[in-house]
Amino acid sequence: MSRKPIIAGNWKMNKNPQEAKAFVEAVASKLPSTDLVDVAVAAPAVDLVTTIEAAKDSVLKVAAQNCYFENTGAFTGETSPKVLAEMGADYVVIGHSERRDYFHETDEDINKKAKAIFANGLTPIVCCGESLETYEAGKAVEFVGAQVSAALAGLSAEQVASLVLAYEPIWAIGTGKSATQDDAQNMCKAVRDVVAADFGQEVADKVRVQYGGSVKPENVKDYMACPDVDGALVGGASLEADSFLALLDFLN
C-alpha cells in the first residue's frame, strides 16, 4: 500500500528562537502540498513556542525532541506532553540514541512516553537503532527488533498504525558514514516485520518507517527509492533552510 512519506528535521541542541523563526520563514512557503509529503522540524524546547507560532499558517509540522511520561508534577527540567499538546505541537521524538546513551533512557521509559504522547493527542516518532559493535556482530535485526517490540508494548493496533518509527543506526549518526541503500531497506523492512509479528500485517502496512543517519540531499533519493523506507529523520542537513528544502527533491 502507498504510505505518505514524512521528512523530519531534528535540530538537536541548535538554534535560538530568532534563528528558528528565520528558518521557518525561509522554508514554510516553499514546501510541497501535504497530499505528497509530511514535513516537520523537531525544535529544542526553548524554541518550541516560536517555531509553532511561525509555522502555524503553513503545512510545516512541529515536533518536540523529547517529553516526560507524566503530565504534571515534581519533575524538574522535564517537558509535559499535555503542555506540548496545548502549545500546538504535532509530534514528539522519543528514544533517540543520544537520549538513550547520554541520559540512560530505557525501553520501558520510551514505552511510557509513547503512551503519554498518545493520551495527549500527539504522535510519537519512535527511534531505534544499533551500535557499530552490534551491527558488525550481525545482531542488528535482533537488537532493533527488541527495541521496537518494547517501545510499542501495550499500544493499540490503531495507535501503532498512526505513529512513525525511525531507524537510525548509531554508527551513522553525525559520523558522515551512512548505511547503504540495501542496509536501510533491510533494516526498515525488519522493523516493519516486527510490527507485523506483534500487531498484524495490516498495521505493518500502514506504519511509516523513516531512515536516519547522515541523510543529505545527495543521498535521500536513494533511500526514498527503498520500498520499506517511508521518510527520513535528518540531523545536520536540516539546520540550513536550503539543504532542508533540497531533501524534498526526491519528489521530482
Curated annotation (Swiss-Prot):
Molecular-function GO terms, alphabetical: triose-phosphate isomerase activity
Gene Ontology CC: cytosol
Keywords from the named record: Cytoplasm, Gluconeogenesis, Glycolysis, Isomerase
One BP term from GO: gluconeogenesis
SUPFAM superfamilies the UniProt entry points to: Triosephosphate isomerase (TIM)
Pfam families reported in the protein's UniProt record: TIM
Compartment(s) of residence: Cytoplasm
E.C. code: 5.3.1.1
Catalyzed reaction equations: D-glyceraldehyde 3-phosphate = dihydroxyacetone phosphate
Active-site residues (renumbered): 96 (electrophile), 168 (proton acceptor)
PANTHER family recorded: TRIOSEPHOSPHATE ISOMERASE
HAMAP family to which the protein is assigned, alphabetical: TIM_B (MF_00147_B)
Family: Belongs to the triosephosphate isomerase family.
Quaternary state and interactors: Homodimer.
The name this protein goes by in its record: Triosephosphate isomerase
Gene name as annotated: tpiA
